[in-house]
Amino acid sequence: MSKQNIDKSTEHSAGENALSEKNHTIESNKNNIDSEEDDEEDEDYDPEKKNEAENEGGVSSDEEEDNDQYKDGKTSKIPDYSTIESSTSQVKTRSQRLHEKLSNQSRFIGNFEVDSKTGLVKDQSNIDVNSIFENLKNGSPSIDNSEELNIDSEKTANSQQQQKQQSNIEENELQGPKQIKIQINYTFAGKLITETKYVDENSQEAKAYLNSTSNISSSNSNEDIPYRRSQVKVIRTDPVTNETKELRIKLKRPSLIDRFLSINGNSKKMKLSTLEKSRLDWASFVDKRNINEELKIHNKAGYLDKQDFINRMNSKRDDLYLQAKEKEKIRKQQLLQK
């Protein structure tokens, strides 16, 4: 037993010695590392060199770095933020659009702009009213400017009207004279004839057609339309009492198609007399040969023109006679009143 105790004690002492040696080596290594770091710091920082540089009038390295940064900031260009695109949407809500619309409407009264500060309509004229009022007070009115402005405005308005008239004339010349459609359905010499053509509005044929059709009724009167009853009277006898009873049975209402056919189906065709037909033929012949002006010149000495002239003179003489008669009555009444 004594030997075992001795062996255990020796082993324990040997382990403690090994641990102490390890701790000693670790502490020595730490001290060596700290000493090396202190040496490096001492080598980087030399206060004597710094003092010498300051005495010579130099600038320290920190100040040089600050100056370099300041110079770079001066020479650097101003950044351009216009190319930056925002990710936010520019869509307006309904309330924003309504508010913007109301604000724009409140700025105008009709076609006149309103001042936002005073709420009055802005003066859009170029006339200085205050200067004119002062000149009127002093007795030296200067209305030349206003007169010149009025003259200029009248000239511009007249020039615009002339330009419009010229443009309308040019358009009419390019488009040509206005044409009208002539469609005639008539019976002549026992035959049904239908003519459809386009003629100038100012032509003799168009005038003759309008004059001839004004005297002819192409539509039927209400008497030609057959009368349709809506109810029918029916008399029946009662077999028990032998009494007669009058019943009214409603008929079927005619449709719109039946009404249209009844009105247009029985319509009479337009009838032209030989005189009216010859007038239309003569007007078309005059337009084809372009002899309207020649006929006007030669017809001045004709019988019909002379009769028209005499009738005009007679009507004018009658008017003058009636006027003189009325004046005489008025003069007599005035004399009686006196």
Curated annotation (Swiss-Prot):
Residues 1-27, 68-77 have a biased composition (Basic and acidic residues). InterPro entries: BCNT-C, Swc5/CFDP1/2. Residues 251-331 form the BCNT-C domain. It is found in: Nucleus. Disulfide bonds: none annotated. Pfam families: BCNT. It comes from the Eukaryota. Keywords: Activator, Chromatin regulator, Nucleus, Transcription, Transcription regulation. The keyword Repeat does not apply. GO terms for cellular component: Swr1 complex. Residues 1-102, 153-174 are annotated as: Disordered. The keyword Nucleotide-binding does not apply. Residues 34-46 have a biased composition (Acidic residues). Its main location: nucleus. Residues 83-93 have a biased composition (Polar residues). GO terms for biological process: chromatin remodeling. Component of the SWR1 complex which mediates the ATP-dependent exchange of histone H2A for the H2A variant HZT1 leading to transcriptional regulation of selected genes by chromatin remodeling. Involved in chromosome stability. Component of the SWR1 chromatin remodeling complex. Belongs to the SWC5 family. This is SWR1-complex protein 5. It comes from Candida albicans (strain SC5314 / ATCC MYA-2876).
